[in-house]
């Protein structure tokens, strides 16, 4: 179902009270997404819960959410499987008294809201089941989130992933853009950020290796060869290892040209100021591409539809050949990296307007 922001009213009628919305943050990307979105949706009052998973809680605090922590993630796979239904039950018991629930790639929120008779709006861009067989956990996830009252997805998303698993086609709503646009739109770049890097103001690129532990990755890393190929060409690299084990990948690279920070750096600041962003997964490449910063993906498996769309458009360059990638980066000029935010802001406005309309449809408000 295509929902055009242009076809919706932009002048809401006065409401008797703000709409109470429950926001559940289940993963580290959620605080940025939902802070940017809820700030753009008029006349709502949020109650926020957060799952204690990696940096989710600290990032929720960083963006300014007031929240309550409910449930946690577990390192062991067996405990992780038990943790999800346990947290779903916790949410069903403890969820606040609200008009609407919202979550992103979050079956726990959808099921808890359904159990309490509260309509839910779910946001996702992950249609991996359309591209890879045998991902039974992902197939189950899509079957569960198909039960949301509404699913909001990018136009590039394969909607049959949801409709084939029980979602009413009229409950799946698309927007002209990408999930990353929503929070990129709220980004305010810091002109002094490059001063935190040891490159004396010289251009740099960002390299983030593959997530080798992910179930969908069945390839060896090219990060060591890529780092060497880049630094051999005199290219400065900010290298973002996923764990300390990944630091070994930089051993053969020129130590004067590669910097692996001990403390976390803002990914959006890096994307804004970089000559190019190179990553073995999807999010950072999409963030950079939506800013108009050159982006390279060396993702080793099947792409999500959102990634393939950006590759097909030429917004992301994809290769698994380290030398080929280094040659591409070396060919870039300053004119190729002119980041902007106007496109992302248009998309955030569209998603916020769509969200407000869906809330109104569920609460009986007229616009």
Give residue ranges: language-model regions.
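Haloarchaeal acidic low-complexity proteome signature biased toward cell-envelope/secretome components but also
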Residues: 1-21, 60, 193-197, 339-367
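A nucleotide-sugar donor-handling region in carbohydrate enzymes
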Residues: 2, 148-219
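Conserved nucleotide-sugar phosphate-binding/catalytic loop shared by glycosyltransferases and other
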Residues: 25, 42-83
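Catalytic donor nucleotide-activated moiety binding site of glycosyltransferases and closely related
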Residues: 53, 63-74, 207-209, 227-261
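Donor nucleotide-activated moiety binding/catalytic core segment of transferases
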Residues: 82-91, 244-284
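A donor-sugar binding/catalytic signature common to diverse glycosyltransferases
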Residues: 101-112, 122, 270-307
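A conserved, positively charged/aromatic
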Residues: 122, 129-153, 271
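Catalytic binding pocket for nucleotide-activated donors in carbohydrate/polymer assembly enzymes
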Residues: 290-331
